[in-house]
């Protein structure tokens, strides 16, 4: 994984921490040397290992983790359900949802306007909503940094 992709993945995952994003963790255990794989909720353990390559073994000190990776389960924007679209439509009028973006109109004074600028608080609301619903808005699935959760029962 390139440093650029590693930083992109880490920034994306840190924004998702409050929402309990699950993913596939693969690593070689430092004590036994055996490979381990499983589905985990991303947490501070993963941040530590992704950034330093080590984890705390308590009385044994820090141990190096080899071959570590974490791939979150995310949904492509195109997999948004009708219920999710209705929830999003309360704040924005969704014109189209594409594999790499959402085209929206902004609601103002009783009508939908494509020319109005979306204010900062609304963008924050949208990003938090996308994180809460585990949507891939960074293109991580396409880059092989995340697993497409469509059709999987992981949440």
Where are these regions (language model features)?
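Structural boundary micro-motifs
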Residues: 1-155
